[in-house]
């Protein structure tokens, strides 16, 4: 079972549809009282997009601190930023606001979630994890070709992934497959 932590964002329902097609799913908001008990039972956790800063999103960062070495984690947009921040990275304003903008992501290192050397991605964000301040425990696996901002990262040893872009959007043609690969990874690790 995958726990999808909902950060008050409508894109969560697109994620839920993709995940729910391949495995059991529970969706709970980031401030739900049963969050930790359901997380304890899950095979992996996905942290959804959402508004605002990661340190203002309910239990988001506390959950990452609690489960980073116990469960596979995938952070999307706000979730990606929260992972970056929890591991000592800096979240800052992007060079430009990217709401509903398609960019090309260049693969900069091998990833368990995608293999194409480049792919179109849909962006909805004004904050980023600063490239030169990503934790040394992480590898940047994808950057936008237009502004070289971090679009994907993964932990060097643990199954922890961050995607700044929206894989659940129709504007990311290979995004659903990325999400399915994460779900498969959670099933393989248990």
Model feature map: region roles:
Residues 24-32:
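A short beta-strand-loop structural module common to alpha/beta enzyme folds
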Residues 11, 52-54, 170:
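Active-site beta-alpha loop architecture of Rossmann-like, nucleotide-cofactor-dependent enzymes
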Residues 2-21:
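Short, charged N-terminal beta->alpha structural module
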Residues 169-190:
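Acyltransferase
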């Amino acid at each position: 079972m995958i726990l999808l932590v909902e950060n008050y964002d409508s894109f969560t329902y697109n994620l839920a549809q993709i995940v729910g097609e391949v495995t059991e799913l529970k969706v709970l908001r980031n401030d739900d009282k049963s969050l930790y008990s359901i997380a304890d039972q899950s095979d992996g956790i996905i942290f959804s997009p959402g508004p605002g800063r990661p340190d203002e999103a309910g239990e988001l960062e506390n959950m990452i601190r609690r489960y980073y070495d116990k469960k596979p984690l995938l952070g999307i947009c706000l979730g990606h930023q929260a992972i970056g921040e929890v591991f000592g990275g800096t979240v800052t304003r992007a060079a430009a606001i990217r709401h509903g903008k398609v960019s090309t992501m260049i693969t900069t290192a091998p990833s368990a979630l995608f293999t194409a050397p480049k792919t179109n991605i849909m962006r909805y964000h004004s904050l980023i994890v600063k490239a030169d301040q990503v934790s040394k425990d992480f590898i940047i696996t994808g950057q936008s070709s237009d502004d070289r901002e971090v679009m994907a990262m993964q932990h060097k040893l643990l199954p922890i992934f961050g995607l700044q872009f929206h894989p659940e959007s129709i504007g990311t043609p290979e995004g659903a497959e990325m999400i399915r690969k994460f779900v498969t990874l959670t099933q393989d690790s248990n």
